[in-house]
Amino acid sequence: MTENLGSFCLVLHSHLPWVLGHGVWPHGMDWVNEAAAETYIPLLMELYKLVDDGYHPKLTIGITPVLCEMLRHPRFINGFVGYLDEKFNVAVNDYNDFTENRYEEGRIKLTKWWQEFYSRVKENFIQRYNKNIVGAFKKLQDMNLIDIITSGATHGYSPLLSKDTSIDAQFKTAVDSYKRHFGRPPTGVWLPECAYRPGYRWKNPITGEEYERPGVEYFIAKNGLKYFFIDTALLLGGKSQGVYAARFPLLAELWKQFESQYKEIPTSFEKSQYEPYLVSTTPSTPGPVGFFTRDEKTGIVVWSGEHGYPGCAEYLDFHKKNWPGGLKYWKVTSPKLDLGKKMLYWPDDVPGKLDENAGHYLNLIKEILKDYKNKNGKKGIIVAPYDAELFGHWWFEGNWWIARVLRWIEDDPEIDLTNSRIFLEN
């Protein structure tokens, strides 16, 4: 009899700042257009294909209020169709140019490949999703497959908001926006930048006034939210895998100052990122809230362009683009290779590499869950959060990889595929 090892929960966090009315390129409308064309719609296409094939693609997806409002705005909806037509025409112009100048046959074929890509995205956007990306995700949630979570209304960094009323307003407004778009209150929340602050006695640096400030969990519970997500270092200690201190000397100095004043608080029990926990709140809130912890082992093999799957030679290179038009015709070849030496992209080489990477990921999940169960005598859960825009935008083939992972996990009796809401309810 096959032994069940535990659960796996994929979490995709999607967020963009408000760009409508701020021009087109490079940080205006094209920002959300690219994300919709390369990430959100291709992800929906893969999820609905799984449903059509009889699968149950369970995962957690965060759509921030700002992004949600943008995707429902008429300016985006009308402009997005024009964007897709424009990209299609770029591929047509490239075909004519490459043919006239007798470029290699593979590069000419790729222009047709791009035409087919943007045609499929447009067809699904208009015909299957009725120009409503948010509604297409809502339908999957109504089918009890995905769990859509919210975030701070303006993606405000909660620990640095000086007034508690501002923190409260972030979550209250987010819940109100969510109800309007999804017809129900959210159960979970993605803290912007995973930034959490516990309760403490705060001293005003100007007036010297002191008073008790509740932790972020208080405002989460107050607004009816039941769980959030944290980075591994917040639970287990140690340094998080950030890069900003290395880039900004002043930030590094501030970090040194913090380290000199920091004292580790001992805990009375061993903690693990492979199980959720509850954080107590005040009696005035509905009850404690739960939190899940990011697993770094499954994280680094995906988000790292140098050590992870996106850096494989066969995948489409993100940086090298054809001018004019900006379409991509080259593969990674090697992550650190000069752009001038990148080789032509061959779509036929991709499925085999995707199978290899998805198989490796599945085995990694099993190894982690099996090790945890052997050591602790109980089943754990791997929570794997990523920026949604990594898949499709940065890693073009990423959504195809996600589909393989979800399909193969559901076929595997050793792993339970779940989302955060279902797991906590059970």
Residue ranges and their predicted role:
Residues Q170-F171, S177-Y178, T187-G188, C194, ...:
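Extended, regular secondary-structure scaffolds
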Residues H13-P17, G62-C68, A153-G156, K163, ...:
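An acidic- and aromatic-residue-enriched active-site/binding cleft used to recognize and process polar
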Residues E3-I108, Q127-K131, G135, D164, ...:
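Trp/Phe/Arg-rich N-terminal binding region typifying the photolyase-homology
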Residues V19-G23, M70-R75, P159-K163, C194-Y218, ...:
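A short acidic (Asp/Glu
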Residues E3-S7, L12-L16, D85-I167, G237-K379, ...:
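Active-site cores of enzymes that catalyze phosphoryl transfer or operate on phosphate-rich substrates
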Residues L43-K58, N130-I146, R180-R184, F219, ...:
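A structural motif corresponding to the C-terminal end of an alpha-helix
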Residues I167-A195, K366-N376, G380-V383:
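CE4/NodB-like, metal-dependent polysaccharide N-deacetylase domain
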Residues Q170, Y218, E397-N426:
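Extended hydrophobic/aromatic segments used for targeting, binding, or gating
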